Amino acid sequence: MKNVIVTGGNGFIGSSLIKKLVANGVNVVAVDITFAGDRLPESEFITKIESGVDVSLAKKIPSGEYDAFYHLAWRGVNGADKADPTVQLANIQMAVDCVNISKQLNVKKYLCAGTVAENATFSLPNLEKTSGGMMYG
């Protein structure tokens, strides 16, 4: 791999991934709404784009060939937003937008993260009541 795109680049998982990629000489376009803090090192291998993730992102990414698109951006991972269907549906739209951006940019591979809460849906038919904590059940 030579060139990749990472959304959520300043988050816990995204910044950890970027550090590993850079250590292996991979050029990274890191996308996040902010790069406040010291999660990412200054590096010639990292291009930072401060932006939300929507269809307009494609125009902000430098032209070139990309081997992978890692979609790790996600809102509402804890607190009240975790149970807010509006926030979670916006996350789903963001993932769909990233798939379309990947296609538009001819990215070779698209990778995204899921949530442990998805596993709860497998037991839903057997539940007597739902937890009410998340939109999954």
Q: Model-derived features: where do they sit?
A:
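Conserved catalytic-core motifs of eukaryotic protein kinase domains, centered on the activation segment
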Residues: 40-41, 79-86, 121-125
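Residues at the starts of beta-strands that form the adenosine-phosphate
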Residues: 3, 27, 108-109
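NAD(P)H-binding glycine-rich loop region in Rossmannoid oxidoreductase-like domains
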Residues: 52-90, 101
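Rossmann-fold cofactor-recognition segment
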Residues: 42-56
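SDR active-site strand-loop-helix element
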Residues: 7, 31, 69-75, 110-116
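N-terminal Rossmann NAD(P)H-binding glycine-rich loop of SDR-like oxidoreductase domains
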Residues: 4-24
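Conserved Rossmann-fold NAD(P)-dependent oxidoreductase catalytic core, especially the SDR/UDP-sugar
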Residues: 96-134
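Conserved glycine-rich Rossmann-like NAD(P)H-binding loop of the short-chain dehydrogenase/reductase
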Residues: 26-37
